[in-house]
Amino acid sequence: MRVTDFSFELPESLIAHYPMPERSSCRLLSLDGPTGALTHGTFTDLLDKLNPGDLLVFNNTRVIPARLFGRKASGGKIEVLVERMLDEKRILAHIRASKAPKPGAELLLGDDESINATMTARHGALFEVEFNDDRSVLDILNSIGHIPLPPYIDRPDEDADRELYQTVYSEKPGAVAAPTAGLHFDEPLLEKLRAKGVEMAFVTLHVGAGTFQPVRVDTIEDHIMHSEYAEVPQDVVEAVLAAKARGNRVIAVGTTSVRSLESAAQAAKNDLIEPFFDDTQIFIYPGFQYKVVDALVTNFHLPESTLIMLVSAFAGYQHTMNAYKAAVEEKYRFFSYGDAMFITYNPQAINERVGE
């Protein structure tokens, strides 16, 4: 399969730079996987699309202020983007500088360059950095870090982004990007879903900066997926198995929830799904056999991204590309702060030929 098969024209004006005033007031494009039928509505219509006993699976990761500015002690300006917190003192990070720092280099971080750190080792494209400070990494980031808005939101981060770029149920700090499908859920909508009898469970996948890396190969099968840490605890496994047993659907909120659940299913030895606490490099593209997820809530993704490939594997390539074409024509808002889709699984997607 060619990466260009997943390209589409997107006017710049449809990229959302700010969220809607109310989280659940965005538009919702519903795609019926088996037929390809499209329905236009608003996000709160989700209430009518879910049945009592259906299971919503959310990702409860919390975005950390992962972008740091400063300079090398030798003088050159640097920008640090945290990929992962290794422990209380160390991070793994991308560093942008005119000349990459060498192991042992001293870094002065923060807008006032008040935080001292040392680049201790290099691991491929990533740098290991140790803070010379009494505070924990998380405390330091909360003090001097900026919210790492995606590159396509072409503006500096603002104080409001510290809450707007978080889900209302975010709990475990560690992500460099928000699981954006979850941004549309507010407390009133969650309360109505609970009142209807919709079940809820929470996985954790700490979204890494790799999620914004373009696919740099021509053929999809040659792409090496970035690694991210995911947790699917026992209570989620039990909720999934119970939903399946009673004939209800498992509905993933966001592609990160999909990747967590399907990673746990891939690793399972004795059951459909088993607890999972590990890094995952799962790459879902057409031909992938879904085992757990029956429906998906997701935002609109970038052309030629691994995420539009994941959606194509779920709903079918042609149905997905037709839906995106309709979304552009109807002027839906795209990407992290944009509108959403509700998609049901197309069991025939696995047999579809792409790009022929």
Curated annotation (Swiss-Prot):
EC primary class: transferase
Residue ranges the record marks as coiled coil: none
Cellular component aspect of the GO annotation: cytoplasm
Domain of life: Bacteria
Disulfide bonds: none
Range of residues in the leader sequence: none
Subcellular location: Cytoplasm
Gene Ontology terms for molecular function: S-adenosylmethionine:tRNA ribosyltransferase-isomerase activity
Pathway this chain belongs to: tRNA modification; tRNA-queuosine biosynthesis
Keywords, in A-Z order: Cytoplasm, Queuosine biosynthesis, S-adenosyl-L-methionine, Transferase
Subunit comment: Monomer.
Classification via PANTHER family: S-ADENOSYLMETHIONINE:TRNA RIBOSYLTRANSFERASE-ISOMERASE (PTHR30307:SF0)
Protein name: S-adenosylmethionine:tRNA ribosyltransferase-isomerase
